[in-house]
Amino acid sequence: MTAGTLAHRPLLGCIADDFTGATDLANTLVRNGMRTVQTIGLPDVGAVQDIGEADALVVALKSRTIPAVEAVAQSLAALQWLRAQGCRQFVFKYCSTFDSTDAGNIGPVAEALLAALDSDFTIACPAFPENGRTIFRGHLFVGDALLNESGMEHHPLTPMTDASLVRVLQRQSKNKVGLLRYDAVARGAHATAERIAALRSDGVRMAIADAVSDADLFTLGEACANLPLITGGSGIALGLPENFRRAGLLPQRGDAASVPAIDGPGVVLAGSASRATNGQVARWLEQGRPALRIDPLALARGEAVADAALAFAAGHGEPVLIYATSSPDEVKAVQAELGVERAGHLVEQCLATVAAGLLARGTRRFVVAGGETSGAVVQALGVRALRIGAQIAPGVPATVTLDAKPLALALKSGNFGGPDFFDEALRQLGGH
């Protein structure tokens, strides 16, 4: 990957702990006027040739659920690369539901990045009001429900059983965690900056920041303009482009989301077991569209499930849905038999194999549901970097690979998108 030109260096460098989260963040930046390139994993020399046009770079790692020591090492390597490109400020992006365990990885990674940047403070704000994620008095809400009553308490890898993010983050951090309360945020950027100064003087290294609206996120962005590191969900990046414009570093532009339309066959691959994805699969099936369910137990028995899926797709002249999505009870039953990690890995690898096989047969448009599944699929497709286009649904943009023969992809976190998302994504990727 070549560095930006001397005349134009990227301003913002971002590290995301999963692929769909990276795309979500990149979507936010593009919508707010920053041309954005997302890399898939740590970049290699020669992976992208036109980085010089990017205002923001997003490195998509797959570090959310790996051992904390590995997540720290990968994140520090990403930071080193982003600094070498000339980025001035950095964002560590994680899920808007704060997906983590007492072992990490949010706390350990944030503390390591702070140390590497020789900084003594950052905020942690996963709020994303547009998708119903808000924080008040340090407690995270998903819609009207507390985090631990939202369905996230059943997450197979990172069950979230405590809505107090101060407690959650403190349990996985060595340094003092505090709360940047709504009282300060509601009074504007100056009051918020004053409260940050008070927290710093009190020895707080990371503060959960309350936010219940986009206006609060813009306030936080302005108040944190001079912090080397900001951490949170994609919403925390809302106000950052305006900081750069205010400083005369970023021009107003209307073409940040410009990407080419991609013709050719399409497919939907769903590995998420979230409520939203279950609803999207149900809508597809209700409409009588062609679909094939992947059975993890059949995979465990060594059956040729991927071959059957490829044959199924070949037998239809329209996009098909290949899915492993099922109800929480069904997921638990499979996990009880196979183990959590093995069950997830089998599904991800099967869908990745199907994606690679479809690519070889000419498929050009891929809609993928689920963060872990998206990570496995983009790796199987050999995707190195993406240009970020217009939004399909909140948090989910259209993307196009930076290749001689580009592919179009929509990579969504499990819980994003309305019931008709699959159809909408296929249409938008094709320029319709």
Swiss-Prot record:
Its EC number is 2.7.1.217. InterPro entries: 4-carb_acid_sugar_kinase_N, 4-carb_acid_sugar_kinase_N_sf, NBD_C, NBD_C_sf, OtnK. It catalyses: 3-dehydro-L-erythronate + ATP = 3-dehydro-4-O-phospho-L-erythronate + ADP + H(+); 3-dehydro-D-erythronate + ATP = 3-dehydro-4-O-phospho-D-erythronate + ADP + H(+). Keywords: ATP-binding, Carbohydrate metabolism, Kinase, Nucleotide-binding, Transferase. ATP binds at H155, S272, A324, G344, E348, G370, G371, E372, T373, G414. Disruption phenotype: Deletion mutant is unable to use L-threonate or D-erythronate as a carbon source. It is an enzyme of class 2 (transferase). Signal peptide: none annotated. It comes from the Bacteria. GO terms for molecular function: ATP binding; kinase activity. Belongs to the four-carbon acid sugar kinase family. Catalyzes the ATP-dependent phosphorylation of 3-oxo-tetronate to 3-oxo-tetronate 4-phosphate. This is 3-oxo-tetronate kinase.
